[in-house]
């Protein structure tokens, strides 16, 4: 057996005390010698200014978006008070998984599913709702894929007394009706996207009748709704710098918990859709690496059906299908790319966080992709030994962690692996049913499909 199960110096779960929770967000851009390229205004072709973003975002969030010099940004007390309802989240030693794999590797996961939204998304939702309330807004609009972000934002808006209008990718809206009902219970209105309620929604429906939607399309609708409705601004759950900033609390807590027991991870793994989770988990560790204080190996894991990092191009592209948002330099499959309706709805995004993209481009991190069948096999195996039913998104990281642990089994190396378990899969049982019935299909886009989508990239130097 790989571990002595009777006498463990490291507990199954490491919890920080409330007094040890982070008081500041960590801004990894401050430690990046080559900063992520700026967002570009599609109308002018120039880097966006504060005034360009003001019609769309809250003022303080714009400040955070554009700030690439301050290493630490204080977390307001009101946000910290809310965090205490479900944070600090546990750092779990996966002893049972290690036993099953018979690996000398030591596996840890940071579990972010201990709240009603079922994921890490609440970390940024409460921050964005706080700044919207502080600005005196009536409400906010947003998009959601699998529904975790929409659920998190509906909770945050309910807490601060804000309206919450959610555009939910149609395939998830249909597959996950109960996620929709959680949002409605918290007072949100939920619209399947693309819809007939916005001009861009009507356009996409006319061009792609019967489409199951995409995150890029839902973003376009949410932005249009915000900019055409008095007293509303747009907020989003991934991709942008401000979101990765808020999510840095995951990595900060993980690092503090590990240091309590003198644990140093060799490999840090996160699933990657828009980059909020992998960016949040890795950023404090990446900061140490960039400052030359420590060395780590970082792995971003994405679905083979939406392989932005592993098969995309590093270029300026629109963040949304309707091309109403600023352009970002990122790894992208093209803003018109609509992936096959796989079950990891939260990873069905054509692009990637500019921060994650730049770090990947510099060779500071790696990326791998998996088909959904092999991801669900890992999810099942994990659930059976660790007692948590993982979200499909999180299960991409589980699969990569298992693969790395099995490599250690072959080599005999005692590496320490840390991965992000972003949330639970209780609302993803339609997907689990397909997997259990042997009806799950794996779709991998052809080179021709990806090239056709990339051919529509805007011609912007950068």
What does each model-found stretch correspond to?
Residues 3-137:
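Positively charged, low-complexity intrinsically disordered leader regions
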Residues 72-74, 204-242, 250, 262, ...:
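Active-site/ligand-binding loops adjacent to catalytic centers
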Residues 111-124, 140-150, 240-243, 269-274, ...:
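Active-site nucleophile and cofactor-binding loops and adjacent substrate-binding regions
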Residues 124, 132-171, 264-278, 298, ...:
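A short, small-residue-rich loop immediately preceding and capping a beta-strand
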Residues 127-137, 151-163, 184-185, 282-292, ...:
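Alpha-helix C-terminal capping segments
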Residues 141, 149-212, 308-318, 429-437:
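Active-site-proximal loop->helix
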Residues 272-280, 372-437:
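Claisen-condensing/thiolase-fold acyl-transfer catalytic domains that form or cleave C-C bonds
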């Amino acid at each position: 057996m790989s571990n002595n199960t009777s006498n463990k110096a490291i507990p199954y779960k490491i919890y920080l005390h409330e007094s040890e929770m982070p008081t500041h967000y960590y801004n990894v851009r401050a430690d990046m010698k080559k900063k992520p390229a700026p967002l570009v205004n599609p109308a002018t072709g120039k880097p966006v200014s504060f005034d360009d973003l003001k019609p769309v975002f809250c003022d303080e969030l714009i400040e955070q978006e554009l700030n690439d010099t301050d290493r630490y940004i204080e977390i307001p007390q009101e946000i910290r008070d809310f965090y205490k309802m479900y944070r600090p989240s546990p750092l779990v030693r996966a002893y049972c998984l290690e036993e099953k794999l018979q690996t000398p590797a030591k596996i840890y996961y940071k579990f972010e599913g201990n709240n009603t939204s079922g994921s890490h998304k609440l970390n940024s939702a409460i921050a964005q709702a706080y700044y919207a309330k502080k600005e005196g807004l009536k409400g906010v609009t947003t998009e959601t894929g699998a529904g975790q972000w929409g659920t998190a934002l509906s909770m945050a808006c309910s807490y601060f007394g804000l309206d919450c209008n959610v555009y939910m990718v149609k395939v998830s809206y249909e597959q996950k009706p109960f996620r929709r009902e959680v949002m409605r219970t918290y007072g949100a209105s939920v619209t399947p996207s693309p819809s007939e309620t916005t001009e861009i929604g009507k356009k996409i429906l006319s061009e792609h009748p019967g489409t199951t939607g995409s995150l890029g399309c839902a973003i376009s609708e949410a932005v249009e709704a915000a900019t055409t409705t008095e007293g509303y601004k747009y907020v989003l759950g991934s991709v942008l710098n401000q979101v990765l900033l808020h999510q840095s609390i995951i990595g900060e807590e993980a690092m503090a918990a590990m240091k309590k027991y003198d644990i140093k991870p060799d490999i840090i793994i996160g699933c990657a859709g828009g980059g909020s989770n992998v960016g949040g988990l890795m950023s404090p560790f990446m900061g140490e690496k960039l400052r030359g204080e420590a060395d780590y190996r970082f792995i971003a894991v994405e679905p083979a059906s939406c392989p932005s990092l592993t098969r995309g191009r590093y270029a300026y592209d629109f963040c949304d299908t309707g091309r109403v948002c600023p352009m970002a330099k990122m790894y992208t499959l093209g803003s018109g790319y609509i992936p096959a309706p796989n079950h990891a709805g939260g990873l069905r995004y054509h692009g990637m966080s500019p921060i994650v993209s730049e770090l990947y481009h510099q060779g500071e991190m790696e990326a791998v992709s998996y088909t959904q069948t092999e991801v669900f096999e890992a999810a099942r195996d994990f659930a059976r030994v660790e007692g948590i039913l993982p979200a499909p998104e999180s299960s991409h990281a589980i699969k990569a962690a298992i693969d790395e642990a099995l490599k250690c089994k072959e080599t005999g190396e005692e590496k320490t692996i840390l991965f992000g378990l972003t949330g639970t899969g209780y609302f993803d049982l339609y997907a689990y049913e397909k997997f259990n019935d042997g009806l799950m299909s794996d779709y991998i886009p052809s080179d021709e499909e990806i090239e056709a989508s990339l051919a529509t990239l805007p011609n912007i130097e950068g």
